[in-house]
Amino acid sequence: MKVLYILYQYLIGLPIIILITLFTAIFTIICFPWKNGKAPRAVQVFWSRSVLWFLLVPIKVTGRENVNPKQSYVFVANHQSALDVFAVYGWLPNNFKWMMKKELRKIPFVGTACAVAGHIFVDRSNPRAA
């Protein structure tokens, strides 16, 4: 069964995720450049939840009722896996901005979409400046 799951992830899930990511990035770039970092949260949630759905990753969220969407917070993800970004993005009710290494800005479409959405790129080459 595990072999079938891995085959599904690479042969079906991954190509679909690449297409969803491209579509979402292009949609964000074209439709929301004037929003000054305020691309609709629905676009971000759609992307995150779609990725996890196509990878067949179950998500169980507890304690969301303790998070006030109108209050400011600092969320810190400790990267237990590559999927924590999607889980946080898709299931936290707050409209937040990621801090990410500046190298991610160079990813075609995705880097531009992140900039349009108002995410923050950090230059980690000089720890004092970062």
What are these regions (language model features)?
Residues 54-130:
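Soluble catalytic domains of membrane acyltransferases
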